[in-house]
Regions:
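Oxidoreductase cofactor-interface core, primarily capturing Rossmann-like NAD(P)-dependent enzymes
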Residues: 2-15, 24-25, 46-47, 59, ...
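Structural signal for hydrophobic/aromatic residues that build the beta-strand cores
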Residues: 1-2, 37, 52, 64, ...
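Beta-loop-alpha module in the N-terminal Rossmann-like domain of NAD(P)-dependent dehydrogenases
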Residues: 44-52
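Conserved acidic residues
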Residues: 19-21
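Glycine-rich, histidine-containing beta strand-loop boundary motifs that form or position
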Residues: 41, 68, 109
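ADP-ribose/adenylate-binding Rossmann-like module
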Residues: 55-71
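N-terminal Rossmann-like NAD(P) cofactor-binding module of classical short-chain dehydrogenase/reductase
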Residues: 31-40, 65
Length: 118
């Protein structure tokens, strides 16, 4: 698990936790030797994935899975209903731009999440 240096969350025993700055140079160092990244950045940090993507490219990471665990955020009608998905579209477009670097990516559209709806 890659998390910010300031994060005080206690993780389960056996989980490798790397606490670091989310600045590009710090991320490049900790991402070296990794094959893939699965981003679980929350809504307030979607745009910060660009720094993570750039660091992954510099570190030679082969695959990036963005924080895209929802419906098809490339759909205009979905983004009209859920405006918070607009930054997710921007990240997918950014990944498309970066394909020429050799970084591959997968966006996971799992459908709407209703567990939190009461």
């Amino acid at each position: 698990v890659l998390t910010r240096s300031s994060n005080t969350t206690t993780f389960p025993a056996g989980v490798t936790v790397i606490r670091t700055s989310y600045e590009k140079f710090a991320l490049e160092k900790v991402l070296e030797g990794q094959d893939a990244i699965i981003s679980a950045i929350g809504a307030s940090g979607f745009q910060e994935q660009k720094v993570l993507i750039d660091a992954a490219i510099k570190a030679g990471v082969k695959r990036f899975i963005p924080s895209e665990f929802s419906t098809n955020t490339l759909s205009e009608s979905v983004r009209q209903l859920v405006p918070v998905f607009e930054p997710k579209k921007a990240i997918l477009e950014y990944l498309m731009e970066k394909e020429s670097t050799g970084l591959t990516w997968t966006g996971l559209s799992i459908g709407a999440m209703f567990d939190w709806v009461s």
